[in-house]
């Protein structure tokens, strides 16, 4: 339908997008979704090529070891790039601030998980629950270590043999741990279609937000506490 003159005025400016008007609330910006998607693909590529290098059956099946090594090295080196580029986004910086803060409600969430308490209200969470914050902290710490040890293995002239041997040990075992943690992260995502839809489209249904992230859902109706 053709807009009438003046339809771009104050009323149009305050009209919410159709998704929000249909009972959905905005969860992630386009920049955040791009960072997540790009980082995920790079990390999956890195893990897949690592498997091809370390599992003999896969190495024999895939072949072309030099190409696999090259793809592994460059995909690993590029993993931090999407996040660094995304820091230009105010929404991403705000979410990083939320991920970096642990509050009393996060400790309550962890206690409820430990007791397997699923009662309503037993697991209060802001925009990110305590599990997501721990996962983000783990990845944020693991990626620089993997990058540093990988560079020592790649450029053999950077350090003596003893250092390179230690770097290889750390790199290999940390890679295995990352693979296990990533598998758990993906399993949780596969079990929650609405969470995946939120990362894909940027918005989620309000009832889901109220059930999974009640403190954040409440804050969407008033000025938000950045600590949540």
Which residue ranges define each predicted feature?
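Membrane-embedded alpha-helical bundles that constitute the cytochrome b-like, heme-associated redox core
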Residues: 1-228
